[in-house]
């Protein structure tokens, strides 16, 4: 359940970033001068017939933001029920989405470009957080890679940080024209991320996440979009369909940046969670989960072994529970196994 809700919230946030880009690049950020109301109307009751021009982009952005907020609350409730460190993720998501809504409103009221930069940067950080949550609540999170070693763990974390800083520099280009730093950040991204993907392929072999290959394609696309955005805004080069093209290119550039950030965050989390002890458990106990391993205790330790330890090979916990005791007469059924958060 939590995994599906995380995916829906992630997709809604992606659409929210899309409309945020449209608001910025069409100059519609101040099309609606008041907040939290819309021309005096309640946010949810503003007439659709009056949503034209910049008002359409700005008010749609607010409505989608409200939807993301509600989805985040639902996701947080699901994560909270899972307990453990999932509760910290739930708390972080709620704090981030509330802060993001307040920043967006203050941007309208105070007319500060600094708030716009922080608002855009936090939106991408929130997308990265949701990407991590979607991964951690999936079955893929239970499949460890081959031990990547400390250097690759540090490198994947560095890649995620560098990509995020480059996104912040992109916001500075949009609102303050800081182009030189953004080009320098692009060089850093293209220096680090391809190395990460190459190292993952070499160290993990067939276990390498497909996302590592997807990252290279996203980087190539991002380079083309970045060059196109630069030519349209900072040069006199003629571009076909200039008005439409110069709206599409920067918006697409921002969206692909979100995907790159999400991918690098997921890779960083995946690699960081893959440690030698976890890999050893996976190799010596095929088919068992980490929870089963922990519950069994060491051989000869005197601790009682859980049901999972005496389970027939290939039979999952869900199947054990559904079969009943031998000779009990209860019908045997074999439901599909699920992780607690799915």
Regions found by a protein language model. Name each.
Residues 12-13, 95-97, 151-171, 218-219:
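Alpha-helical transmembrane segments of multi-pass integral membrane proteins
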